[in-house]
Structures are given as C-alpha cells and as structure tokens.
C-alpha cells in the first residue's frame, strides 16, 4: 500500500499498517465502478484480504480510525461484490470500534490507551468513522452500534462546532463528569483557528449525520460549517491549510477542498431547490479549482491530487512538518469521490 503521503511527489509503500490504506482500496473500487475493468476489482479484493489479515494480526488497530480503514475498502467491497470476507472484516472492525466508546462523556476516544486521562478526547475526523457503525447496525440489527454513533455525533456537535460555524479539531473531556474540559488543536494553526481539513470533515460529517438521523440541527450545522469554509476561501478556491489564512504564502490543502466538495454534494438531496443550486455551484467551484490547479500529471508512483498537507507546524501546535505540498491518500480518494459524485448517479460507500 502507498504510505499516507508522497515524498518529493512519489509514494513509498508498506504493508497494511497505517490509518490510510482504506483510501487506496476505495480508489480501486471507484476505478472499477467507473470503468468496469476487472483489474481494479481483482486488486481491490486482494486488498480486502489484507484488511481481514490485519484484524487477525491486530496490527495498529487500537484507535478510532477503523471507519477510514474498513468503510471504503470492505463495506464498499461487500456492496459491490457480495464478498463474505469483506462483510465479516467490516463487522469485526465495527465491533472493535465500539470498544473505544466512553459512556462518561458519550464519545469514541480517538487515540491512546482507553481511560488515559491525557487522551480522554474526541476529534472531528471521527465523524467519518461513524458510518461503519451505522452500517453494522443495519447489517446485524444490533442497536448498540447506532446508539454509539448517535451519541458520539451529539457530543461532537456540542463540543467541536462553534457558534460562528467554525470548528475545533479536538476536545478533551472530563473522565469523571463527562463534561468538556477544553477545545484544542492537534494539526491546526492554533486552538481557536479552524483547521481546513477538520472543517471539511465537519461539512461531510454533518451531511452524513443528517442522512442517518434526520435531525434538523445537524443540517443546520452543515449549513453553518459549509458557509464558514466557503467564505474563507482565497480567490482560486483552494483553501489554505488553516482557514485563519486567506492570503499569503502559507501552504494550501487541496484535500480539504475535495472533502468539502463531497460534503456539499452529499447534502444536495436534503436542501430546498434554491439552496441546492447554490450548494451545487459551490461544490462545482471547488472541484473545478482542483482540476485546474491541483490535478497531478501522470507519473509513476505519483499521486492524483497535488498540493495537500498532512501536518504543518505552527508556533501553537506540536506537530512537525510532514507531507506539506504533497499528495496524500485521502486527498486522492476524495478527489476521485467528488468527481464520481458529480458525474454519476453513485451510491456512496459511507451510507
């Protein structure tokens, strides 16, 4: 599998061990749906086997990103081929994800040892891990999965979404009272800014949350989150890595635009006609900007979408620069998904 991001424009490879291989398999499934060519189906099914083997090895699975891993790979594979192996792997991953649930605070703990006070928190990215639980509830009839997904969504809506429509990346919770302690950032510029990719997760995550729950409040949060994102775009419609920036030389994050476009397309059936037209136009502008400014030329080992950011250091966060102005797997995947959503009557892998 490709590593999470390119280095000097080229992906290195490793076994199925990081949080991102599901996006690569998802791209194989998208390519299969677009072309009907068996080479993509065969490759994707071979990769599904590696996801099942990873569960047996218990290889780096003690975190919340099981949805990113198993939805675009195994859930998609089951839907497209009826593969029993894909279904079983996805159900096992969903069962493991429930073990991250913290009843005190009602959220899925993102990282670290369960009940570690230093890691007692949720992050906005996890909204895209919840579809695995909704799918498992549908498949098994076990309400435990949907109850956890619903509870986490409600907590995220309360503690990660600000009144102005911007979002926090992460929020620490009190393990005794379950109340929020403080909202912080891990990969954004600073705690009170809006990390662009996190904002995009919020857009797509709330659009999906509304699909699953039909809660009007989640559609309103989608609207506010999308409006904030769109008003912070520079003239070329490719967002900076943090939305605190609207001009200058800071790196752009093309992956945030791709994810946000998918969120806007996802919400279209839920919107009144005039609003639907505006949302479609906004999504089209984002997608056009990616095609014009970020689409990668064909290159062995290269990515699909240039100018992404994995981590960007700032005076206020603790990350080091990694994958800055490079392609990354989630950007490549969601760019392909956005193109698919725009050009086909496509059933999403996420719902």
Residue ranges of each PLM-predicted region?
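Glycan-recognition and catalytic cores of secretory/periplasmic carbohydrate-active enzymes
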Residues: 1-351
